[in-house]
């Protein structure tokens, strides 16, 4: 099986459509379908900050749950939206406010439909996907080699947030260790979460979050070809959101 793994979309629907078309997908049915049966995989954070979060929920639900032609691994923004939909006490900030504003503008019956779809998508998706006979792993923020095969709370924190130290930068963002430099496995780990200006290949890992919602690019990785394909963002460039190249 061949896959096209898509970086953090964050509600950037037009960029997602442009990227999938560039990757050879046809939208004539209203969904991106590849003529050669390639499958999409999402590294999570499909909502928040961008303009079309609810439409992205509908599309990913259709592909993953209804048609079963794609894979989705939830990100930290997905986890927070899930908790919001469950009625938990979450802070509506850091991008969630845009998704909530879209949601609250809907009539109640459409709100219920979106809520049910997202809860189903989240609950029926694993923390990470191991594909191609363990040659490929798709997750949101990365994973340590010794965590592969586990699904416990420690692994959940890692795949959603990265290798956080518990410390904070001056801007309040968490300090993260560079786990990819320590990764020695042969399984390719494809992930996002931390925006980089260009796809970052380190050992057998690839970060494909190229900051679409911050004016960078939306990137996909073609597997097993290991080729990256990107389209430019239509949003303003916010340079301080990108990790320095190292």
UniProtKB/Swiss-Prot annotation:
The keyword Magnesium does not apply. SUPFAM superfamilies: Metallo-dependent phosphatases. InterPro entries: Ap4A_hydrolase, Bis(5'-nucleosyl)-tetraP_PrpE, Calcineurin-like_PHP_ApaH, Metallo-depent_PP-like, MPP_PrpE-like. One of its GO terms (molecular function) is GTP binding. One of its GO terms (cellular component) is cytoplasm. Its EC number is 3.6.1.17. The keyword Cell membrane does not apply. It catalyses: P(1),P(4)-bis(5'-guanosyl) tetraphosphate + H2O = GMP + GTP + 2 H(+). Keywords: GTP-binding, Hydrolase, Nickel, Nucleotide-binding. Coiled coil: none annotated. It comes from the Bacteria. Its cofactor is Ni(2+). Belongs to the PrpE family. Asymmetrically hydrolyzes Ap4p to yield AMP and ATP. This is Bis(5'-nucleosyl)-tetraphosphatase PrpE [asymmetrical]. It comes from Bacillus thuringiensis subsp. konkukian (strain 97-27). The gene is prpE.
């Amino acid at each position: 099986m061949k896959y096209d793994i898509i970086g953090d979309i964050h509600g950037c629907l037009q960029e997602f459509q442009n990227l999938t078309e560039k990757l050879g997908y046809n939208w004539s049915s209203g969904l991106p379908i590849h003529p050669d049966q390639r499958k999409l995989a999402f590294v999570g954070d499909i909502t928040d900050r961008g303009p079309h979060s609810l439409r992205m929920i509908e599309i990913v639900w259709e592909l993953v749950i209804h048609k079963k032609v794609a894979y989705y691994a939830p990100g930290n923004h997905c986890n927070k939206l899930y908790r919001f939909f469950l009625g938990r006490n979450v802070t509506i900030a850091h991008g969630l406010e845009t998704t909530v504003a879209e949601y609250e503008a809907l009539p109640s019956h459409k709100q219920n439909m979106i809520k049910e779809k997202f809860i189903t998508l989240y609950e029926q998706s694993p923390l990470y996907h191991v594909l191609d006979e363990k040659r490929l792993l798709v997750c949101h923020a990365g994973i340590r080699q010794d965590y592969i095969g586990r699904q416990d709370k420690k692994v959940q924190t890692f795949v959603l947030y990265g290798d956080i130290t518990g410390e904070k930068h001056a801007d309040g963002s968490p300090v993260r260790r560079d786990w990819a430099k320590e990764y020695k496995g042969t399984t390719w780990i494809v992930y996002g979460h931390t925006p980089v200006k260009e796809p970052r290949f380190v050992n057998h890992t690839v970060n494909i979050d190229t900051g679409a919602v911050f004016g960078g690019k939306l990137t996909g990785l073609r597997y097993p070809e290991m080729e990256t394909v990107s389209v430019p963002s239509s949003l303003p460039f916010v340079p301080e959101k990108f990790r320095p190249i190292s």
